Structure formats: structure tokens, C-alpha cells
Swiss-Prot record:
<dbReference type="GO" id="GO:0003735">
    <property type="term" value="F:structural constituent of ribosome"/>
</dbReference>
<dbReference type="InterPro" id="IPR001865">
    <property type="entry name" value="Ribosomal_uS2"/>
</dbReference>
<dbReference type="GO" id="GO:0022627">
    <property type="term" value="C:cytosolic small ribosomal subunit"/>
</dbReference>
<dbReference type="InterPro" id="IPR018130">
    <property type="entry name" value="Ribosomal_uS2_CS"/>
</dbReference>
<keyword id="KW-0687">Ribonucleoprotein</keyword>
<dbReference type="InterPro" id="IPR023591">
    <property type="entry name" value="Ribosomal_uS2_flav_dom_sf"/>
</dbReference>
<dbReference type="InterPro" id="IPR005706">
    <property type="entry name" value="Ribosomal_uS2_bac/mit/plastid"/>
</dbReference>
<comment type="similarity">
    <text>Belongs to the universal ribosomal protein uS2 family.</text>
</comment>
<protein>
    <recommendedName>
        <fullName>Small ribosomal subunit protein uS2</fullName>
    </recommendedName>
</protein>
<dbReference type="GO" id="GO:0006412">
    <property type="term" value="P:translation"/>
</dbReference>
<dbReference type="Pfam" id="PF00318">
    <property type="entry name" value="Ribosomal_S2"/>
</dbReference>
<keyword id="KW-0689">Ribosomal protein</keyword>
<feature type="region of interest" description="Disordered">
    <location>
        <begin position="267"/>
        <end position="303"/>
    </location>
</feature>
Length: 303
């Protein structure tokens, strides 16, 4: 399974949480300390919990299960699409359409409509004989559907796992998954509720580098899991035991790094880091604000 190091997490700014006035008390056990009004996430726990989550995703992928990558905030959109495509999985990176999971039949009708419009547009003369205004309307409809559904149009039914960037922003997706018993793996910042997530990965869910790091590692877990599935006499235990020496060494370091040493390098990192942004701004490197939410193209109550 993919390895991840303390150095990678520090360089990506994974340890920067939200302002101390914006936090969820349930995240207390994952907090290392506080610096200049910003909570610092305990990367020791992030390392271990990422390893557990990645192993779970790899096991599911090895069993032929499908993973849906979800990240609609602006700084997550590109990484989510790229990594999901790389591991041949599915994604939602624009809008989470209400009822996407709980009213899948309705969403599939929209997907069917998208494929009809794509087929029409791909054939020369597909719009022949139609008024110009109608052609413009159909193209507008096709582009709108493609923007919202392109990442799931080939998904064969409900996903088996959700990988989520920011469980707060994607709260509707998390609730729908929980209602259907679909496991949720999520990057959970200091302002989130970890009880809503099955596999918690404590970390910065706003920094571009942190998002890309986690998305790429989860995609690696899917790729490696699928590769193991092709081996003869595969068992779930083999995922745990069949690691290359290099990977095994890294995972040993990841899980058993001395707590005092971990605290030391985190403290050194913080002392050398630049001062956090003023309280009115978000923390950490490469942070961006989320895009304003617009009304979804498909609206279902999710009942």
C-alpha cells in the first residue's frame, strides 16, 4: 500500500488546522497544539490513520469495488478529477447534486440524457434540420450536464466507497452515503465532525498541496489494490503482507516513529514557518476560499 512520510505531510501543510475559534470539540484528540490562534493537527495520528484508510481503500479496490472521489471546492476540483481518472474511478468535482446517491434512478435519467446529447453532437449533421435556437439550447444543456455528470456517467450504479475532501463542505454527500451504508473515507479538518466519517484522516482540507497529496495517495491505493486483484489466489490478507521492502520500510517508519521525535520535528517546522495569516484569512500554504455554491442542475429531495 502507498507510503507517506512525516516530511511529506509537513511540506504540504497538512498540520495547519483552522482558527481556534472555529473548531469542533470532537477533534480535540487529533490536535497537537495551538500556535498564534491556529490549531496544529497531530501528524502522528494522521500518519497512522491514513495508513489504515489507504489499506481499507486498497482492499475494497482489490475486491473490484468502486470508489467515488468527491471534492467540489475550487482548490480540490483539478486534483480530484486527475487522480480519479488515473486510477480509473469516478468523481464529483463541481456540484453535489441532491439525491445523487439516494435517488440514483433520477440521476441516471440525466446521465442517459447526457449520453443522447453527446451521441447527437458527435455525429456530423446530428443537429441537421433543427432550428438554430434549438441547437443552441441543446448544446447548452449538454455542456451543463457534462459539467456536473461527466465524472459519474460511466459509474455502474452506487459506489462502494466515498473518498471525500472536507466532510463539512460535502456534508450532503456524507449524509447520503451514511444513509445507504456506504463507507466514507475523508480528510477531516479541525472544524469537522469526525463521528460522521467511517475512516478519518485528520488534516488540512484547504491547502492545495495537502489535497493533492492525499488524493494521489488514495489513487495509488486503488491502483495497487486492483493490481493485487489480478494475482492468483488473492486474499485480503495478502494486501497487508505483500508489500515491497521499500514500502514496508516506509510503513514501519510511518507507524512507529518515536512520539518525542515527531513532536520535535513538528515544533521545528512550526518555529521555521511563516506567521499564520490574519484571523480573517484561512491558514496554511496554498489556501483558497471555496467557490460559492450555486443551485444544482438536478434537484431531488434524497427521500
Amino acid at each position: 500500500m502507498p507510503a507517506i512520510s512525516m516530511k511529506e505531510l509537513l511540506e504540504a501543510g497538512v498540520h495547519f488546522g483552522h482558527q481556534t475559534k472555529r473548531w469542533n470539540p470532537k477533534m480535540k484528540e487529533y490536535i497537537f497544539g495551538e500556535r498564534n490562534g491556529i490549531y496544529i493537527i497531530d501528524l502522528q495520528k494522521t500518519l497512522k490513520m491514513f495508513k489504515d484508510a489507504a489499506r481499507f481503500v486498497g482492499e475494497m479496490a482489490a475486491q473490484g469495488k468502486n470508489v467515488l472521489f468527491v471534492g467540489t471546492k475550487r482548490q480540490a476540483q483539478e486534483a480530484i478529477a486527475e487522480e480519479a481518472n488515473r486510477c480509473q474511478m469516478y468523481y464529483v468535482n463541481q456540484r453535489w447534486l441532491g439525491g445523487l446517491l439516494t435517488n440514483m434512478l433520477t440521476v441516471q435519467k440525466s446521465i442517459k440524457r447526457l449520453k443522447e446529447l453527446e451521441a447527437m453532437a458527435s455525429v456530423e449533421g446530428g443537429y441537421a434540420g433543427r432550428p438554430k435556437k434549438e441547437v443552441i439550447r441543446l448544446e447548452r444543456e449538454r455542456k451543463h450536464l457534462d459539467q456536473n455528470l461527466s465524472g459519474i456517467k460511466d459509474m455502474p450504479g452506487l459506489p462502494d466507497v466515498l473518498f471525500v475532501i472536507d466532510s463539512n463542505k460535502e456534508g450532503i454527500a456524507v449524509k447520503e452515503a451514511r444513509r445507504l451504508g456506504i463507507p466514507v473515507v475523508a480528510i477531516v479538518d479541525t472544524n469537522c465532525d469526525p463521528d460522521e466519517v467511517d475512516w478519518v484522516i485528520p488534516g488540512n482540507d484547504d491547502a492545495l498541496r495537502a489535497i493533492r497529496l492525499f488524493a494521489s495517495k488514495i489513487a495509488d491505493a486503488v491502483v495497487e489494490g486492483r493490481a493485487l486483484a489480478t494475482e492468483q489466489d488473492f486474499t485480503a490478507d495478502k494486501i497487508i503482507s505483500d508489500e515491497t521492502p521499500a514500502e514496508e520500510g516506509m510503513m514501519e517508519y510511518t507507524e512507529y516513529v518515536d512520539p518525542k521525535y515527531a513532536e520535535k520535528i513538528m515544533a521545528e517546522s512550526l518555529s521555521m514557518a511563516e506567521e499564520p495569516a490574519p484571523p480573517s484569512q484561512r491558514k496554511g500554504p496554498a489556501s483558497e476560499t471555496a467557490e460559492p455554491v450555486a443551485e444544482p442542475a438536478v434537484t431531488e429531495s434524497g427521500s
